[in-house]
Amino acid sequence: MTKPTTEQPTIVKCPTCQSAVVWNAESPFRPFCSKKCQMIDFGEWADEEKSIPGAPDMSDSDGWSEDQY
């Protein structure tokens, strides 16, 4: 006989507003709490306010400058 599952749902914090978000299929914007928070985060990445640390792949001084052509 199997035991009934009494697992607590996984709760995460919204990366934008820090509110609690249940991590399941019924949370369509996870890890965000809403479409608004998802779009705020997307805008921060698009404006390069957020980035993944590391050396840049190329720069204008690497010979890819438009002035060259």
Curated annotation (Swiss-Prot):
Q: Which residues bind Zn(2+)?
A: C14, C17, C33, C37
List the Gene3D superfamilies. Answer: Erythroid Transcription Factor GATA-1, subunit A (3.30.50.10)
What does the record say about how the cofactor binds?
Answer: Binds 1 zinc ion.
Keyword ATP-binding assigned to the entry: answer is no
Q: Which Pfam families match?
A: YacG
List, alphabetically, the SUPFAM superfamilies matched. Answer: Glucocorticoid receptor-like (DNA-binding domain)
Q: Which InterPro entries match?
A: DNA_gyrase_inhibitor_YacG, Znf_NHR/GATA
Q: Where is the composition biased (Acidic residues)?
A: 59-69
What are its GO biological-process terms?
A: regulation of DNA-templated transcription
Q: What is this protein called?
A: DNA gyrase inhibitor YacG
Q: Which gene encodes it?
A: yacG
